[in-house]
Amino acid sequence: MRGCLQLARWLRAAPKCPAASLLKPPSGLANPARFFTTSTACWASRSRAPASQPSSDLESRIAAIPIDRYRNFCIVAHVDHGKSTLSDRLLELTGTIQPGMNKQVLDKLDVERERGITVKAQTCTMIYNHNGEDYLLHLVDTPGHVDFRAEVSRSYASCGGALLLVDASQGIQAQTVANFYLAFSQGLELIPVINKVDLPSADPERALDQMEQSFELDTESAVLVSAKTGLNVQQLLPTVVEKIPAPVGDVNNPLRMLLVDSWYDSYRGVICLVRVFDGEIRAGDQLVSFATGIKYFVGEVGIMYPNETAQSVLRAGQVGYIFFNPGMKRSKEAKIGDTYTKVGFEKVVEPLPGFEEPKAMVFVAAYPVDADHFEHLEDSINQLCLNDRSITVQKESSHALGAGFRLGFLGTLHCSVFEDRLRQEHGASIIITPPSVPVKLIWKDGKEEIISNPAKFPEDEELRGKISEIQEPYVVATLTLPDEYLGKVIELCESNRGVQKSLEYFTSTQVILKYELPLAQLVDDFFGKLKGSTKGYATLDYEESAWQTSNIVKLQLLVNKAPVDAVARLVHYSQVERLGRQWVTKFKEHVDRQLFEIVIQAAVGRKVVARETVKPYRKDVLAKLHASDVSRRRKLLEKQKEGRKKLRAVGNVVIEQKAFQAFLAK
């Protein structure tokens, strides 16, 4: 009560002000419109203070550049040929970042810096002055590994050309060939670039000859650079300006915008990377999605420069980011390849074709180490899937490991990187099963069914009788290698059920070998074996081929005749004995001894293909006996033997979870 009286006296004593003056923003505020804001916007600006205020100098320069002086391009190459290092040099050359203090600026994930590879395609806007005129350049740094081909193909949708980068010391490699044909099929203007010309082993002439013979590219305009030292990098940007066409679009048409990528921010929710094809977009505009029909208000627009830098407008031809206010409620609403337009223009604007999402071909099961962390693991997986839509997720449960997920990936590296990101970015402790591939069941009534979970594989004799055939996926693998290792590589491919398709020399010492291989063999550490056979000199690329009839069976691990469902796998019959022996030997190492015998078996149906036994603890029941008391001795040993039989009949084997973790670890 006393507090209320004091407040009333203070209000009476305060100077009287007109009500209108109370609505004026504080003097000196740069943008009065931003004075009143929702709590979401407050959090957004607080979470990224340096980027929330648009740079007036930068905006005025961009506004003065017409669309015919825009250039959208990407860098494509084989893994480890220097794409990210070249991106750094281009950013330094255009003044986007300070020189000398940067290393792989566009590799933003911890796993990318740790492994030295690019996993996510990253974008950056640059301004380059050429012959007295400003050009707006948009650069995409793409991954080189085959597992991230979807990232590369999506990047092409926002580009008019590409720098085709080749290592001067290694020449054309398997993924150089694959990336070339992918870019060529999209109609991109390709500029050949030879990197690492400063190396003692560099042979630029050989690399240029390979590009001319293999790709029929005009190498007269090729640029020879060293991204590490910056040699000749300044010649690249004039070539980009002169060779790569400007994007097509009209700022006066209704908005037509493509969602290229998305990621999650703790405060702002889903942030979308977009390419504007027509019209323009500003904060406050109301948009509608063609895929979901949901309407959103735009909270902020901006460009990557190289980090998020807010702008007042994104125009036709530009690539930038947007987020909504209020934000997207569910991450599934951000569909990669979706078209957005302003509300009211849905019937006028034609949606863009979008992307063909690749199918997951490698499957693993993931379980939390602690069952109480299941919900945290689910949230972590959903957030990472927002940024990588090629991953498939299904819930499943195991008697041994509890509730978990069956995850589908494009390849084994894709799976390994996802596992690292879960641990590094979300602190998840997980158990991952070995990778497996789907199989196709063709029933006698003509129905087809693809299964990726071994638990759904029919084992009942009656059900098996209704199956006409079982098929597994095959791939066509392209291998490049020095000819001195040709014999070993052919032997490796043949032992992995491969069928040779072609063999050609593209130089006097380099061979391109094509093999049709089962995908199951490819995910079983084929790449590691290939590197071992060639001392690291071979490269591998592959593409899906077809489904082929195969003798697929379900291999199970049994502990005292009880199956361990989390470890079951679908394998070719020829691999059963090798894999079964490997399983029982490894599992025996991690199982603690019990008071009774533990029998570990690998079995296909009722047929046991391998067995190991964990001996029980044995109590010395003869310790107190006299050596000459033979009948008493025999009686005690018989009693111990009977007790063991009874214990084995009624006792359950307790396998600690750490045993499964150790067994499933690579």
Curated annotation (Swiss-Prot):
Output the PROSITE patterns linked to this UniProt entry. Answer: G_TR_1, G_TR_2
Transit peptide: where?
A: 1-43
- Location (main, coarse): mitochondrion
SUPFAM superfamilies recorded:
EF-G C-terminal domain-like, P-loop containing nucleoside triphosphate hydrolases, Translation proteins
Q: Name one Pfam family in it.
A: LepA_C
Membrane topology per record: Peripheral membrane protein
Name the Gene Ontology biological process terms. positive regulation of translation; translation
The catalytic activity of this protein is classed by the Enzyme Commission as: 3.6.5.-
Molecular function GO labels: GTP binding; GTPase activity; mitochondrial ribosome binding
GO CC terms of this entry = mitochondrial inner membrane; mitochondrial matrix
tr-type G domain residues are 68-248
Record field: catalytic activity: GTP + H2O = GDP + phosphate + H(+)
Where would you find this protein in the cell?
Mitochondrion inner membrane
- Residues engaged in binding GTP: 77-84, 141-145, 195-198
What keywords were assigned to this record?
Answer: GTP-binding, Hydrolase, Membrane, Mitochondrion, Mitochondrion inner membrane, Nucleotide-binding, Protein biosynthesis, Transit peptide
Biological role stated in the UniProt entry? Promotes mitochondrial protein synthesis. May act as a fidelity factor of the translation reaction, by catalyzing a one-codon backward translocation of tRNAs on improperly translocated ribosomes. Binds to mitochondrial ribosomes in a GTP-dependent manner.
The similarity annotation says:
Belongs to the TRAFAC class translation factor GTPase superfamily. Classic translation factor GTPase family. LepA subfamily.
NCBIfam families for the chain: lepA, small_GTP
What name does this protein carry? Translation factor guf1, mitochondrial
Q: Which organism is it from?
A: Aspergillus niger (strain ATCC MYA-4892 / CBS 513.88 / FGSC A1513)
| Record gene name | guf1
